[in-house]
Regions:
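N-terminal targeting signals for export/organelle localization
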Residues: 1-13, 55, 117, 121-123
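A short beta-strand-turn-helix
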Residues: 8-34
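Short pre-active-site segment immediately N-terminal to redox-active cysteine/selenocysteine motifs
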Residues: 31-32, 39-42, 87
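Hydrophobic beta-strand anchors of alpha/beta hydrolase catalytic cores
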Residues: 35-36, 68, 91
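Typically the conserved alpha-helix immediately C-terminal to a functionally engaged Cys/Sec
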Residues: 47-61
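Structural microenvironment flanking redox-active thiols in thiol-disulfide oxidoreductases
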Residues: 66-81
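Non-catalytic, surface beta->alpha helical segment in thiol-disulfide oxidoreductase systems
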Residues: 87-123
Length: 123
């Protein structure tokens, strides 16, 4: 079972935000908080971060019900441009209410768990 689902632009516009219709205005379409990993297949730090995100996705999948997605910036250049992604990895944390927050670079699992708990779960 895939714990971190890769999204293309069409899936992103139905599961996360319709970036075509809501230019300049954030409207989250998801039913659960989400974490999105902007990555590249050639990126060493992205490869190191991937298993950590898989572990977190498994940890939060049932307990707190958070969706984990990934976007390949080489395949989905439009999405990367919308979010100003110029380096990878970049993580986008999307709470149910409020504005999303971006974080650059890979972090240890403990740091990511703390950020998820604070930003997405309000703990």
């Amino acid at each position: 079972m895939e714990t971190v689902k890769q999204l293309n632009k069409q899936e992103f516009t139905t599961k996360v935000a319709d970036i075509e219709k809501s230019k300049g205005e954030w409207k989250f379409l998801g039913e659960r908080p989400a974490v999105i990993d902007f990555f590249a297949t050639w990126c060493g730090p992205c490869k190191a971060l991937a298993p950590v995100l898989d572990e977190l996705a498994a940890d939060y999948q049932y307990k707190d019900r958070i969706d984990f997605y990934k976007v390949d910036i080489d395949q989905e250049q439009d999405l990367a441009a919308v979010f100003g992604v110029r380096s990878v990895p970049i993580l986008l944390f999307i709470p149910l209410n409020g504005m999303p927050q971006m974080m650059t670079g890979g972090r240890p699992k403990s740091d990511l768990k703390r950020i998820i708990d604070e930003v997405l779960m309000g703990k």
